[in-house]
Curated annotation (Swiss-Prot):
It holds the Pfam family DUF986. Belongs to the UPF0266 family. It is a multi-pass membrane protein. Keywords: Cell inner membrane, Cell membrane, Membrane, Transmembrane, Transmembrane helix. This is UPF0266 membrane protein PM0830. The chain crosses the membrane at residues 1-21, 45-65, 66-86. GO terms for cellular component: plasma membrane. It comes from Pasteurella multocida (strain Pm70).
C-alpha cells in the first residue's frame, strides 16, 4: 500500500504544479497577455467517469484501504472535478505568440487561420499540424478575429 500512496501523492503534486502553471505562470510568461479568451470546456464526461470509477474502488475496498489512501483518492476525485468543471481552458494571445492547450506557439509558425462553423477557429501551422480552437461565444470570436487582423 505504501507504493500506491507514494504514486498518488506524486500524481497529486504534479497536478498541483500544473494547476499553478495554468492559472498563474502562463499569464506572466512569454510577455504581456494582449487578449485572454475562455474556450469551451471539454472532457467533462471523462472526468465524471473517472470520478465514478475511483468512487467504486473506494466503495469496494473501503475496509482494506488505509485512511491515508482514502484521503488521497478523495483528493484525486476533487482534483478531477476541478479540472473538468471549475477550471476553464483559455487561449492567451501574447505579443509574439499564443498559448493554446498550455503550449506556446509563435505567430511566425502559423500558415493560415480560418473560421469554421460553431465558433471553431482553425489554425494551420507550417509544420502541418492543425489546431482547433473551440471559442465560447460570438463575442470571443470577433475579438480573436480582430486580433488577427479582421476578415480577409
Amino acid at each position: 500500500m505504501m507504493i500506491i500512496n507514494v504514486l498518488l501523492c506524486l500524481g497529486i503534486f504534479c497536478f498541483l504544479l500544473y494547476a499553478f502553471y495554468d492559472q498563474f505562470f502562463m499569464d506572466c510568461w512569454k510577455g504581456k497577455t494582449l487578449l485572454k479568451v475562455h474556450l469551451k470546456k471539454q472532457g467533462q464526461k471523462d472526468a465524471l467517469i473517472f470520478s465514478l470509477l475511483i468512487g467504486i474502488i473506494i466503495y469496494q475496498t473501503y475496509t482494506n484501504l488505509s485512511s491515508a489512501t482514502l484521503y488521497l483518492l478523495t483528493a484525486l476525485i476533487l482534483l478531477s472535478v476541478y479540472a473538468a468543471f471549475i477550471r476553464a481552458p483559455m487561449l492567451l494571445l501574447k505579443e509574439k505568440g499564443f498559448f493554446f492547450g498550455n503550449i506556446y506557439f509563435q505567430y511566425a509558425d502559423i500558415h493560415q487561420v480560418n473560421l469554421a462553423e460553431n465558433n471553431i477557429l482553425v489554425i494551420d501551422m507550417k509544420n502541418g499540424k492543425r489546431l482547433l480552437v473551440h471559442l465560447l461565444t460570438d463575442q470571443d470570436r470577433e475579438q480573436v478575429i480582430q486580433f488577427f487582423g479582421g476578415y480577409k
